Amino acid sequence: MPLPLPSRSSKPETKKSRSSKIVPSGNNGQSEKRGENYQEKISSSSPRRLCKKRSAFEDLTNASQSQPAQLKKEANKEFVKDVPKKIKGNTPALGLAKSNEVNMVSYKLESSPGVVSTTLVPNITEKPLILERSTTSGTITTEEASFFRKPLILKEESTTEDTGLIKRSLFLKKFTNKGEISLMEKPTSVQEEADSNDEFVVKLITFGKKHKTEEVAITKGTLSLKKMCTYQEDLALQDITVEENSFFMEPTNFRKKPKTDDVTPTKKMLSLKKKKYITLGKVSRMKKPLVLQKTNSEDESPLIKEPLAFKKKPTKKETTFTLRPLSLKKYTTQGKMAHLKKPLESQNTSGEKALIKEPLSFKKKPITKEESLFQEFSASQEKHTTDREVVLLKKPQVLQEEKDSKDKFLMEPMFLRKKCTTKETNPTKKPLPIKKKCTIQGKMYYLKKPLVLQKTTPGEESFVKEPLSFKKNTTELSMLQEKYTTQEEVSVLKKALTLQKTLTEEESHLKEPLAFKKKHTTEEATPTKKLSSLKRKRFTAQGKRSCLMKPLVLQTSSGEKTHIKEPLSFKKRSAIEESFFKESPVLQEKHTMQGEVALLEKPGALQENVSSEDEFLMEPISFRKTHTTNEVVSTKEPLSLKKKKCTTQITMSICQELLDLQNIISKDKASFFMEPVSLREKSLAEEVILTKTPLSLKKKEITQGKIFLLKKPLVSEKTTSEEESLFKKLLPFNKKSTTEGEFLFQDPSVLQEKHTTPQEVSLSTKPLTLPEKTTTEEEPYIKEPLTLEERPTTKEEFLSQEPFSLHAKPTNEDESLFWKALGLQKTQTKEDSLKKLLTLQEKNTTDEESLLNKPSILKEELSTKVATSIEKELSLKKKPTAQGEVFLLKKQLALQENITNEESLIKQPLAFLKPSIEEAILRESLALQEKPRSEEETLFKEPLSFQEKPTLNEAFHFKEIISLNEKHSTGKELSLKEPLALQENPTQKEDTSLEDSLILQVETSSRVPSTPPESRAGMSSVGKLSTTSKSSVCESSSNKPSSSWGESSQKEMTPLEDIDRNHGDPFFNSIYAKDIFSYMKEREEKFILKEYMNKQTDISSCMRAILVDWLVEVQMTFEMSHETLYLAVKLVDHYLMEVICKRDKLQLLGSTAFLIAAKFEEPCPPCVDDFLYICDDIYQRHEMLSMEISILQTLKFDINIPIAYHFLRRYARCLHASMKTLTLSRFICEMTLQEYDYVQERASKLAAGSFLLALYMMKLRYWVPALEYYSGYKTSDLHPLVKQLNILLTLRPSNKLKTVYSKYSHQVFFEATKIPPLDMLKLEEILNYC
């Protein structure tokens, strides 16, 4: 007969008063309201207990720490009492999530609440959509304004004061080299102030807007600054007064001193000191930076889109948004350094509050005049210069730099404005994204600014050359980014080296702009600066080879001492116009003859850096050419020539471009520089091709120690007179392709070279994949140097290696024969590849995406071979990485990224025209950019897997690169990349968890290329997924195409514990989670239930079902956890399997088992009287206690029985399943509790079957491979169980026991019962398909 349910109306008052302490009402605030049907059973007179209870819905929060607003809506309804107190504790987090602007402004982990609120897909998707609207609208919405204003103002100051920031950074780096961190510390304190001074940042924007009327007065102050520089700049400033001065207005008004002359440079210095100081040292704040990166990366793509829209509108916000994404990307590129954002904010805020104070103390003398400030700067720089001899140059440089920097930057916005006002919106668009890149590192503005200054003097010609200046900036950006990436990856040595690099590079950058002005002022300084920049770049390019760098530095110092003599000496060495270029080959020849491969590597590294930076310059050039239709026509040829020049050497390109500008600006002085100009025109344009090839060769040489001697003599010989003649032959071909074909022709090379830049790994996804591959591939390269040499011959090498073979002849007959063979091989392949590329390029000239697609098309053609080779090599290295060599790999990767990546990565891009590994790598990066295609994903998954094994460092690099890919991609690609970036950057706490999902995506891509629309809706929310949430909106990450799991999945998915990082539940401790669940699966074998109902004489399976239905009601009444319910049912079954139970004791057994389970699971379990009461007092206290003893003795006190609920939570967390999917699986699993037929199923298998059916019902089949991996069960093994479960759901309406059904029909449980079960025929199709 059915068990009696408690009827409280019949209870006497005495019992009511006796048990008044037990009422499960929400005295503790756990549930304010109760269902009516339960109040009938447990009236107000029911016992009141003061203990804390977890609700049935508590586990929902276990899967995801926060509940959406639906919980609030249902607060007054029947089952809200089931919502645990944890959810209520998280409601403020939800509120925070709603006010995203507050969280984003604070840049604290509070941004994660916004992420936490992603349990409901609609709510979260709305927020990201709002963010995108606001960003694209061109107006800063109230939500984003607070978040954007900080970076915007950062960049606004940087726009007006970018040069100042650059100066400061130079300053800082000089100080940091000497260890004078005292100056740095002040900025840090200022930064701390700035963290709390978010409002200040907001005020800056308002100031800038309010005081546009006052801009003229301030511009006059700036004009006074510029008077010190040139009168032309003053005129230009007057032209710009309205818009450009708005940038000045903000800092000046905030300073509350119209003397922007003095205050701004000091602020710049201080803020840059902060930058430097923070970027160098404070990696300890990794967690916050990660979150910051998440927020940044989430907003980067929309921000990038904004500048495109804003470019059309030449308002002040154009530069601000453009600058902001730059800063964001800078931080993402720097990965661990991401907390730079706060420093940057502090640079604005503190830079505007406390920086005034510090500059005043620092500048007490020169308050009235900036010259004195500049002199102080020069003096400080003299103190801290790495080279004593450089001091002579630095003083005038610093003076001119700081004079120029402000003026130059002002001038540059002038042109931007002019472009905006004039019809040249297209050119403005490109400069703006390029500015973004430049703003990523304010240091780069030196080139822009001098270029712009010189542009202003001639007039309209500046428009044509403006992209050139941007190109230079981008190259330097790449340099700087390389520095930062190397600093992140490399240990203390790298930091020191990078400091040196940054010092030298900054000096070189300073000197280059100084060279601009010195060219205007004095003619002698320019050649020395060029040389110094060349040598410094050598110095910087060598990076980790500090020992080798020193001799180069000595050369630079000597070069700086003898301003004119040094270039003359170079010319003497080369005896040809190619003197600058040949200097490195001459040195190489010397070193090669000596066999000092290390010294040879230096020039190689120099050229590599040169090529990497210059090549990066080349990319913006190509982009601008494609977009700036008006200007490009005039500039395409010189740009292409300059691209080639840049690829040869940055110094060459800089000198050449400077000479061009000089020729345009000062024709009087042109005579002095005419020789370098001619050099450029003749040898550089021609030699560039060779220089690229020697670079590739040198890169090869560095990886291949023995071949250095061969290649380097070849390089030196290449630089000889034969190069010119051969190049002249090649020049017409190159010139033909320059307008259209060569842009794209170089664009692939640009792409290649981008990726070749080892330090620019942050800028290109390819380098990250490549560095890892290069580590894997270095071995085969070293093993097969000759084959590699033959491979990496890109088109450029094809052009150059024919002359190579010709050049090689004079060196050695053997080498000449060797190179001839190589040349023949390469020429055969090169012609085909060149034709293909040219055709592809000509077709896709207008689109930036075409530039990416071209290599992708080529790669697709050549991918099969490459894929196999990559897989083999990756497999080779996957083994050692998994074996604990991850540290070694990371170190090697860092080193290789600076050294071998510069070399081998350049190799690979060069080789990527041929069917080489780079093609697959580019394909992989493109796969990320374009959304992984089934073909590209197959190749891409392997680099992902490789990255996953090194886990943290490589994961960071990978994610940074993904975010940086957005920089290189157009707005369309950004729209595609945003979900990826959102997923990958914010999950840096869950580094490998996302990578796991990515691997799932990649490997499962072949069958289902497209994602369901519902999954796309949640994409943005996935980007905000909090690591603390037990389950996140996993439909959002359903951009993962589905297919076979793949053989390598087992290897790739090793770092499971990262999924559990920062998880509050002890079951999901990141260190122990994997071991815990593997142990639970082992324990399952000890608790396998057998059929016991046959030997039970007095009870049946129907009575058991009634008991379980009643236990579900008890669990809801006492608001206890689901774990308690599942464990109680397990205890009952195990007891019944051992002991024959009477019918009248069955309810006692159930209540006692629930008591034991509550003691085991609940923090505040109900007391015995509570259970006696719910049993309607039909049992006595001693009976329950004796039953408790009996159960424990029967089970031998081993009651830690694995339950299906734990496994459900685990699967949901591993798959990042949404709450709706998880709740559906819980409903299915809880339905099985009543059914005796499922008693024999293992808990883990039952959970896997329930979750699999839920995935099928939610149309999320592409997660099935992931479930297979994490559960350990094959879908084929689960299919019979899935069919049974689907039948159970289909027949549930006819079931008389409705408690579970009614429980999950509530909105708190997402109305899981309303989701229809699958049709049996459809299920059969699904199962057969799988």
From Swiss-Prot:
Modification after translation, per record: Ubiquitinated. Ubiquitination leads to its degradation during anaphase entry, after degradation of CCNB1.
SMART domains documented for this protein: CYCLIN (SM00385), Cyclin_C (SM01332)
Keyword Cell division: yes
Pfam families in the record: Cyclin_C (PF02984), Cyclin_N (PF00134)
An annotated GO cellular component: cyclin-dependent protein kinase holoenzyme complex
Top-rank taxon, per record: Eukaryota
GO molecular function per UniProt: cyclin-dependent protein serine/threonine kinase regulator activity
Keywords from the UniProt entry: Cell cycle, Cell division, Cyclin, Meiosis, Nucleus, Ubl conjugation
Covalent S-S links between cysteines: none
Motif D-box, residue numbers: 54-62
Polar residues bias locations: 20-30
Region (Disordered): 1-50, 1002-1059
GO biological process, one term: meiotic cell cycle
First-listed, main subcellular location of the protein, grouped into a coarse class: nucleus
Subcellular location: Nucleus
Residue ranges, compositional bias (Low complexity): 1026-1048
InterPro entries for this protein: Cyclin (IPR039361), Cyclin-like_dom (IPR013763), Cyclin-like_sf (IPR036915), Cyclin_C-dom (IPR004367), Cyclin_N (IPR006671), Cyclins_cyclin-box (IPR048258)
Keyword Hydrolase attached: no
Free-text domain note: The N-terminal destruction box (D-box) probably acts as a recognition signal for degradation via the ubiquitin-proteasome pathway.
Family named by the database record: Belongs to the cyclin family. Cyclin AB subfamily.
Subunit structure: Interacts with CDK2 kinase.
Function: Cyclins are positive regulatory subunits of the cyclin-dependent kinases (CDKs), and thereby play an essential role in the control of the cell cycle, notably via their destruction during cell division. Its tissue specificity suggest that it may be required during early meiotic prophase I.
Protein's name in the database: G2/mitotic-specific cyclin-B3
